[in-house]
């Protein structure tokens, strides 16, 4: 954790990685695209030297639950500005429950703090908790306005859970690009958008994610750390955004998005694992 925080003020200029360095990754991604009849976008940003590589990095993909990191970052930002109190409570009503709410569905009739709602959102991907946060930060428009404020001109949020997960081809609503969201995560975790205290809180929520054990975490190199957030939606949408680092490796921001495929969830998960393994091999092979 200390190593990650050491880079909290570092946002280097982007330098495009040599094509040869990521040649195998690109070949692997293309092979998976063909095998799943999918559309895939990937971006990799090394925060130490600004080295950047992508595959379909400027194409739009459904945000799905990867928006939750941004929504909770907006809550932290608003708290810094005195616009919201993260310790304020919201009553949980049965009528507000939406699909997949493993934490909130057990607390109907009780109250939850906004801070705890973010914890549930980020660690279990609880959709009702996410809607509670959205309501507190000005809705989808509030999140999109925040993105524009920090320089992200591509990512947009238009709907709440669960509608935002529709994933229909050609629909610009609730989409991002792998390149844009990697840059945004860089600003949120290592830039000046949030205070160091809130950067640590956002990082902690991502580190304690409980629903991604079968994705990048399953092939994380020994001694490495990860902070991540995943998502899934209609028309084969599956995604993950992550920061990985080790004692000797500066944080690397990875975003992987799949869309427009009839592949099963297991097949999509396996695709993310294979792509992640290929990316990690680029960095571990350098230290051999």
From Swiss-Prot:
The keyword Coiled coil is annotated on this UniProt entry: no
Residues annotated for substrate binding in this entry: 229-231
Disulphide bond pairs: 72-118
Coiled coil: none
Keyword presence, Nucleotide-binding: no
Gene3D superfamilies, A to Z: DD-peptidase/beta-lactamase superfamily (3.40.710.10)
NCBIfam families registered for this protein in UniProt: bla_class_A (NF033103), carbeni_gen (NF000481), PSE (NF000480)
Protein name (database record): Beta-lactamase CARB-3
Species this chain originates from: Pseudomonas aeruginosa
Gene expressing this chain: carB3
């Amino acid at each position: 954790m200390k190593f990650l925080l050491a880079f909290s003020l570092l946002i280097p200029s982007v330098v495009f990685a040599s094509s040869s360095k990521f040649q195998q990754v690109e070949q692997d991604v293309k092979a998976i695209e063909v095998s799943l009849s999918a559309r895939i976008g990937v971006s990799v940003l090394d925060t130490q030297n600004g080295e950047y590589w992508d595959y379909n990095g400027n194409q739009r993909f459904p945000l799905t639950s990867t928006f939750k990191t941004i929504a909770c970052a907006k809550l932290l930002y608003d708290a810094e500005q005195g616009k919201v109190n993260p310790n304020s409570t919201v009553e949980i009503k049965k009528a507000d429950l939406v699909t997949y709410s493993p934490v909130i569905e057990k607390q109907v009739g009780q109250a939850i703090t906004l801070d705890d709602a973010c914890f549930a959102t980020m660690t279990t991907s609880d959709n009702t908790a996410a809607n509670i946060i959205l309501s507190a930060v000005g809705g989808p428009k509030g999140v999109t306005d925040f993105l524009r404020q920090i320089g992200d001109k591509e990512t947009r949020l238009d709907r709440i859970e669960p509608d935002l997960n529709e994933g229909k081809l050609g629909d610009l609503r609730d989409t991002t690009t792998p390149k844009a969201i990697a840059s945004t995560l860089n600003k949120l975790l290592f830039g000046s958008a949030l205070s160091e205290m809130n950067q640590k809180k956002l990082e902690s929520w991502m580190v304690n994610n409980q629903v991604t054990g079968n994705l990048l975490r399953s092939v994380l190199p020994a001694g490495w750390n990860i902070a991540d957030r995943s998502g899934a939606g209609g028309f084969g949408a599956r995604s993950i955004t992550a920061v990985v680092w080790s004692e000797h490796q500066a944080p690397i921001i990875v975003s992987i998005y799949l869309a427009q495929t009839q592949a099963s969830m297991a097949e999509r998960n396996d695709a993310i694992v294979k792509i992640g393994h290929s990316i990690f091999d680029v960095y571990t092979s350098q230290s051999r």
